[in-house]
Amino acid sequence: MEHTLPALPYAMDALAPHISRETLEYHYGKHHQTYVTKLNNLIKGTEFENATLEEIVKKSSGGIFNNSAQVWNHTFYWNGMKPDGGGVPTGALADGINKKWGSFEDFKKAFSASCVGNFGSGWTWLVKKADGSLDIVNTSNAATPLSGADKPLLTCDVWEHAYYIDYRNARAKYVESFWGLVNWDFVAKNYA
């Protein structure tokens, strides 16, 4: 099965001023597209040729895993943001956050510190553990909770290509701006 670049759930300039159109043109239009193209080339003639993206992520390794996971991670990241996002979660998700961190502000500080402290290229995730509790997990490179027992709820891409055009080497400024985009409805649906 040929995998395609999923459409963004908003216009290329819709995340400005937090994330510029130029960043999306490179990050989505070039980086994400390249992962899709490489994945399609790598799976030809393999057991993964007709597999779904999630099946490939869960069962593959090496280059096939790296590219499939990056396609999945990026799609998840785009869906976790929206124009005029931000604010605070409500309902069961807010309760889960308060149970683990005491308050949304304390969660936000912990998640931001994890993003900024995630060495090198990778992802910072809010995940739901098997016991229903929440946690913050850092992964390196293409690694994703999808291939393990944790259920991903939200992610922040901390690869430099996610923020370098807009924020240069100021990852902390990018992370602070990310909070103005979070799509809490998407996160809550993942939590349910």
PLM feature spans:
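Feature for soluble, non-membrane regions of globular proteins
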Residues: 1-192
